[in-house]
Swiss-Prot record:
Coiled coil: none annotated. This is COBRA-like protein 6. Belongs to the COBRA family. Its main location: membrane. It is found in: Cell membrane. It comes from Oryza sativa subsp. japonica (Rice).
């Protein structure tokens, strides 16, 4: 019985370790790292490495991705184009030309925009930023070229790197083993000739919010026209001990944020950008709130028409040290399959399972509100969504008008307790409630959102 119990525990642990990186709204989302060997050299090979973000609504923000691995033997990196290793390592055994990196476990980062053209290749040099595939599929890829030495020089003698890691930019990603796949076929610029990689292997990395952080990074609050109750984010929704100290006044927040940026610049200038001090200064600097979340999403049921209803979405940033560029918001609600119009946000449906269309991805309009500014008077973006009613399912009762799940930048937000949702008064039908309660609810909502 003891052996059987141990076996069951092992199976359960394995199941949980797989399930923890599974996102039911994006079941096939992953980041794939592809190595294409383009040519052999006297002591190794030249490979084109491509990082494809196949996650529908999770991006990699600045300071960008970091890819690492362990060489199987004593390989070195002679040179790179479009990226660089962060540490050269000990190359003292080489007497003449020194390799770009001699570490057995190199860590590679993207180059910054504006580097000389002879250091660039296609899809490089964006500071490691990768947009979500559902948001910008043509830009959701990065690439660099690496020349590997002291390695195999044929398909039979090459040993694949192992123990791949991916930071995006923080933890949360788990990478599988490198696997040889059919060689990539390329089409020439005139589209009249095909060429083929000499060898190709793939590495698949999946994200787990539970590995990335102990606490959520966002929370959700609710309000409605038919009830003057505003349901706030749950107390300590993002961990009250995780973000200490916090800032009580906007003036202090701005002052500390500027001080942090100057300290960070000085640390980088003196080569201490990766030190403990710099890491501490990069930590979130949050406004003091009861929920202590960097981001709050507010869903307000605003208006009720005969055939339509309208909801207002407001995203508020409480972090004085973070701008969210290219942000994404995902909401799950059964009426999102009948969206008629979205005001001041872009919108795409997220269809994960056949014909089920109950999930929508929202993101900002380019050069208008695609950047959620740091905490303060400009640290919010908002939009309204107009939806056509389905007479078979539509109701304001039992919290039906509020979303089931909300994600910000790919991370699931903490929802309020279901028993706290604004209820529909029994004494008045929805139309009457709309007229009686709108003014009171809107006044309270404005005060709440500005707090």
């Amino acid at each position: 019985m003891a052996v059987l119990g141990s076996l069951l525990l092992l199976i359960l642990a394995a199941t949980l370790s797989v399930a923890v990186a599974y996102d039911p709204l994006d079941p096939n989302g992953n980041i794939t790292i592809k190595w294409d060997v383009m040519s052999w050299t006297p002591d190794g090979y030249v490979a084109m490495v491509t990082i494809n973000n196949y996650q529908t609504y999770r991006q990699i923000m600045a300071p960008g991705w970091t890819v690492g691995w362990t060489w199987a033997r004593q390989e070195v990196i002679w040179s790179m184009v479009g990226a660089q290793a962060t540490d050269q390592g000990d190359c003292s055994r080489f007497k003449a030309n020194l390799p770009h990196c001699c570490r057995r476990t190199p860590a590679v980062v993207d180059l910054l925009p504006g580097v000389p053209y002879n250091q660039q290749i296609a899809n490089c040099c964006r500071g490691g930023v990768l947009p979500a595939y559902g948001q910008a599929p043509s830009a959701a890829a990065a690439a660099f070229q690496v020349s590997v030495g002291q390695a195999g020089t044929t398909n039979r003698t090459v040993r694949l790197p192992r123990n791949f890691t991916l930071l995006g930019p923080g933890p949360g990603y788990t990478c599988g083993r490198a696997r040889v796949v059919p060689s990539t076929v390329f089409l020439t610029a005139d589209r009249r000739r095909k060429t083929q990689a000499l060898m190709t292997w793939n590495v698949t990395c999946t994200y787990s919010q539970h590995l990335a952080s102990k606490y959520p990074s966002c929370c959700v609050s609710f309000s409605s026209f038919y009830n003057d109750t505003i349901v706030p984010c749950a107390k300590c929704a993002c961990g009250c001990d995780a973000h200490k100290p916090c800032v009580r006044s906007e003036r202090d927040g701005k002052r500390l944020a500027v001080t942090g940026k100057k300290h960070d610049a000085n640390a980088n200038a003196h080569g201490r950008g990766n030190g403990v001090a710099a890491a501490a200064m990069a930590a979130p600097l949050l406004q003091c709130t009861t929920h202590m979340c960097p981001v709050r999403v507010h869903w307000h049921v605003k208006l009720n028409y005969r055939e339509y209803w309208r909801a207002k979405i407001t995203i508020v940033n409480f972090n004085y040290r973070m701008n969210y560029t290219g942000w994404t918001l995902v909401a799950q609600h059964p009426n999102l399959d009948n969206i008629t119009e979205v005001f001041s946000f872009d919108y795409k449906p997220v269809v994960s399972y056949g014909s089920i269309n109950d999930t929508a991805m929202f993101y900002g309009l380019k050069y208008f509100n695609d950047q959620l500014m740091e905490a303060g008077p400009h640290g919010n973006v908002q939009s309204e969504v107009l939806m056509r009613k389905d007479a078979r399912t539509f109701t304001f009762r039992q919290g039906w008008a509020f979303p089931r799940k909300v994600y910000f930048n790919g991370d699931e937000c903490q929802m309020p307790p279901p028993d706290s949702y604004p209820y529909l008064p029994n004494a008045a039908p929805p139309a009457a409630a709309s007229l009686v309660g709108s003014a009171v609810a809107m006044a309270a909502l404005v005060f709440f959102l500005m707090a």
